[in-house]
Amino acid sequence: LPRYKCIPWEYQETMEYKGSFYMDLCSDGRQYYVGIMEYQEDGVIYDFIDNEEFFSWGNPYTNLIDDIPKFCYFSKAALAALNYLDWVPDVVHCHDWQAALVPLYLRTCFADTNVGRASAVLTIHNLKFQGIYDRKMIQYWSGLPDYVFNKDCLTQNWLDANMLKGGITYCNRLTTVSNTYAGEIQTEEYGEGLAEHLRYHQNKNRRIVNGIDINIWKPSTDKLLKANYYSKTEIENKKKNKKALQESLG
């Protein structure tokens, strides 16, 4: 995760420094600092990439001209951090255009490293946002080899590059957030200019529905509820749960 400045200090002050290094990023070999900070909550370890130049100002999403360099840096730094920590995942799960360069980095810049053995899954939440910008700018900031900037991968309309399109090309599996959305984005009406590309890569597509496991979060058996209920019409027990939640939140 990026260590954004907007993360509440109560979490940041408990982060533990795990190491740092410098990484080549741009096509001219310019180097950037990569710090690794670790945070633990309920037995889960979260690793944060620390770099004040990219993450110390603004919100997670600002404007495209600033977000392109930021997410080129983050995508490459996250993989470099895994190598630094000597931790090789079986699968790297990327979300939307912001992390769509990860599959390309895995198969190019990191192909001969330990993390290069990982498979890449790319999830599309909203196809409308694709990370499209001037090809020369994305080529410079990503430092990716020239051969990935072609019409079947990153290039769009010759002058632009499309980061999400490149991720679709290089990922091992592509997932969407519903069964219907997977089909819709392959149509000209909802494909946002990528319908043909998505149809070409449809063999990668797996459909994972957003939502909850109703066998776990079941009102009649959920032990976390103050009062269980079996029907939508059992208002009294719902009121008890509402009151318990309000009391727990002060």
Predicted segments with their positions:
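Catalytic cores of nucleotide-sugar-dependent glycosyltransferases that transfer UDP/GDP/TDP-activated
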Residues: L1-G250
